[in-house]
Amino acid sequence: MKKFALLFVLLMSLAAVLLAACGGSSGSCGSSSGTSSGSAPTVHMCGNNFVQTSITISKGQSLTLVDDASAAHIIANGSWVNGSAQLKKEPGAPVVNNLQFNGNDSKTIGPFNAAGTFRLYCTVHPGMNLTVIVQ
């Protein structure tokens, strides 16, 4: 009986460590600011979320995504809706077909040449959506 109790405690401790490693955000994540003066619009990714969920950019601009943590991301056109991934090619949006981030890197999407509202999502992390508003 003592061996069973010890095994149970060890398994629960391991589960707690794994859950803590997968969730939350670290203190080393990027700024929530959408742009810096004089630079391209930027959205940071931290853990399993975009630091900000929407950004407004000007027609003709590109968007830089920055992965501030070691989490891998695969970004595509579309969004998560009620826990289900909805791949969607939107007219006027640059095609984003499984753009891979392997942690601590950045990539640029665009240019966004048409005005409108476009959606991007991480195919790996449910609920990780970004709305890009182009004016």
Predicted regions mapped to residue ranges:
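Bacterial N-terminal signal peptides that target proteins for export
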Residues: 1-9
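Extracytoplasmic copper-binding redox domains, predominantly the cupredoxin/blue-copper superfamily
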Residues: 5, 17-18, 22-135
